[in-house]
Amino acid sequence: MLRTFMHAKLHKARVTEANLHYVGSITIDEDLLDAVGILENEKVQVTNNQNGARIETYAIKGARGSGVICLNGAAARHFQIGDEVIIMAYAQLTNEEIATHVPKVAVLDQENSIKQMLSQEIAHTIL
């Protein structure tokens, strides 16, 4: 049996662009993708801490070191520049893989630079 677990998370990212006329997806600084192990075209879930919007899309690489977090296409209607978002990717794991699974979580600052890397989330933690 496979179970679905979070394997990567960009926490407290800030939207830098919203491009309604792009075909779709979310553009993410390639350094941030690498830090948490999200691959280009991988399915991601994006939640908006300002308005509660929650979408699923796929990641595309943005310029390294740019800090870009750009919602493209229809998603741009639910995310505004400056909104704080959480970007998560999931993996389907076997029971054997679950025993050793360690998600990668990057907590970002206001400029989308990595402030802290976490290997676990502790209940009731406020960052």
UniProtKB/Swiss-Prot annotation:
InterPro entries: Asp_de-COase-like_dom_sf, Asp_decarbox. It catalyses: L-aspartate + H(+) = beta-alanine + CO2. CDD domains: Asp_decarbox. Pathway: Cofactor biosynthesis; (R)-pantothenate biosynthesis; beta-alanine from L-aspartate: step 1/1. The modification Pyruvic acid (Ser) is found at S25. Belongs to the PanD family. It holds the Pfam family Asp_decarbox. It comes from Exiguobacterium sibiricum (strain DSM 17290 / CCUG 55495 / CIP 109462 / JCM 13490 / 255-15). HAMAP family: PanD (MF_00446). The active site is at S25, Y58. Substrate binds at T57, G73, A74, A75. Catalyzes the pyruvoyl-dependent decarboxylation of aspartate to produce beta-alanine. Its EC number is 4.1.1.11. This is Aspartate 1-decarboxylase. Is synthesized initially as an inactive proenzyme, which is activated by self-cleavage at a specific serine bond to produce a beta-subunit with a hydroxyl group at its C-terminus and an alpha-subunit with a pyruvoyl group at its N-terminus. It is an enzyme of class 4 (lyase). Heterooctamer of four alpha and four beta subunits. One of its GO terms (cellular component) is cytosol.
